[in-house]
Each structure stands twice: as C-alpha cells, then as structure tokens.
C-alpha cells in the first residue's frame, strides 16, 4: 500500500505528463500573454492555473470559441400533403351538398311552422 505522499507524487507525475505538450519556454510572460491554443486536457489545479488561457477556459469555464449551432431537424417531405391532394372541383362538389342540406332543413322548418298556425 502506498503512503499518501507517494500517491500525491504519482498524481503530480501524471499531471506533468498531461502538460508535456506545453513547455515552459513556449508560454509567454503574463504581460504579453495572448490567448494561444493550449491542447492540455487535464483539469487538475496545476494545469488550470498554468497559463491565462487555461485559467479562463478550465478554471472559470469561459470559452470564446464560436459555438456551432445545431442544424434544424430535417422534416420528412410529404410529396402529397393531405390538404393539397384534392382538386378544386372535388372541393367544390363536397361543399355544395352541405349547403343544400342546410337549405332543405330550413324549408322543412318553415313549412312545418306555416302549417301549424
């Protein structure tokens, strides 16, 4: 079983391995530090504070990259929509009987009232 100190040393070694893509020579001074790309994916305390870019991105969670917008879900195009597949003559024929039924009902009601009085 390892002692707690050895476990900490092992975690520091793994942290150093993660940050090996960035060398201390490549990091500019804090005064002239511009936010250059940092490919370190470790989120340990040491790696979060090792440069301004990592502090903003990992420590504070601020990311200035352009976010990709989701593409709208593709709707299935129906080649024959239900409302447009009937012709004009079919629509006109379907409407006329409804009007005739209303007129016949009205005439029957009028006839019934006239005979009863």
Curated annotation (Swiss-Prot):
Keywords: Activator, Host nucleus, Host-virus interaction, RNA-binding, Transcription, Transcription regulation
Keyword hit for Transcription regulation: yes
Ranges of biased composition (kind: Basic and acidic residues): 1-19
Gene Ontology biological-process entries: positive regulation of viral transcription
Cellular localisation: Host nucleus, Host nucleolus
Residue ranges annotated as motif Nuclear localization signal, and RNA-binding (TAR): 66-70
GO molecular function: RNA binding; RNA-binding transcription regulator activity
Region (Core): 55-65
Protein name as catalogued: Protein Tat
UniProt organism field: Simian immunodeficiency virus (isolate F236/smH4) (SIV-sm)
């Amino acid at each position: 079983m390892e002692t707690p100190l050895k476990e900490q040393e092992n975690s520091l070694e793994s942290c150093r391995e993660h940050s090996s893509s960035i060398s201390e020579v490549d990091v500019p001074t804090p005064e002239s530090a511009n936010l250059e790309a940092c490919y370190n994916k470790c989120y340990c305390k040491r790696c979060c504070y090792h440069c301004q870019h990592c502090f903003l991105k990992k420590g504070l969670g601020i990311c200035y990259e352009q976010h990709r917008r989701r593409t709208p879900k593709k709707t299935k195009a129906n080649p024959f929509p239900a409302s447009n597949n009937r012709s004009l003559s079919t629509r006109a024929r379907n409407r006329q009987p409804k009007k005739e039924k209303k007129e016949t009902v009205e005439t029957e009601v009028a006839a019934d009232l006239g005979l009863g009085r």
